[in-house]
């Protein structure tokens, strides 16, 4: 018969009798699939399934689940882990020249899970072709996954992000580029900002203080920005060309200018 979560937690043994540490990664998937999971976690926390002290770590990539659903069911400390900054990425790739790390950081950012997939023994081009431009690559569908993990209407959000990535970064520009109503765009941008995908910044390049106050939008998530700048607008050709041909045609020539932004 199928073992319940309560039975499973009750069978856990600790190598150190002073404390049991239970770490569950991407816990939101289990919780959404089976309501009894969080009930069992609560019982474990209250020492009903294990006699000694217990430290429970529920890791998740879902902001909504962490701040709303989990917070309602599970009272405890919260910690948001930020991406690595540039200096931390330099230390991660200590064998590589800084110029190469600038390229890596400019393409995939400081997300540890992305960096762990990067093969420092291979060139920047080889890694992008292998991870990003190959359908079986680890980061091929990652930009869509980042968006759809928290938001519906992937197509609409993708249209807006593609507009911003090509420089249509003011509300009026996005309106003309997408054909969506200004009200709809404002709601979508607010949602994207809530999940740290897009941010609004003040820019004096727009001319005058009044325009500066209105600000411009830019994609905050480094890899999402890279994807919508280079890959998404040319997806039809990605199906026709080899990853190497696609890289040479659509990425290589504009990469340095992109990294200087």
What are the language-model segments listed below?
Residues 1, 49-52, 94-100:
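Short, polar/flexible loop-turn hinges at active-site or ligand-entry regions and domain interfaces
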Residues 66-157, 161, 165-168:
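Interdomain motor-coupling "hinge/lid" segment immediately C-terminal to the ATP-binding subdomain
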Residues 17, 51, 73-76:
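Short, well-ordered coil/turn elements that cap or connect secondary structure elements
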Residues 120, 125-261:
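Accessory nucleic acid-recognition modules appended to NTPase machines
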Residues 15-16, 48, 96, 167:
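Short coil/turn helix-boundary motifs
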Residues 12-37:
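Conserved P-loop NTPase "ATPase switch" module shared by AAA+ and STAND
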Residues 1-15:
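Short glycine-rich substrate-engagement loop in P-loop NTPases that contacts/grips substrate
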Residues 29-33, 37, 41-71:
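Sensor-1/coupling segment of RecA-like P-loop NTPase cores
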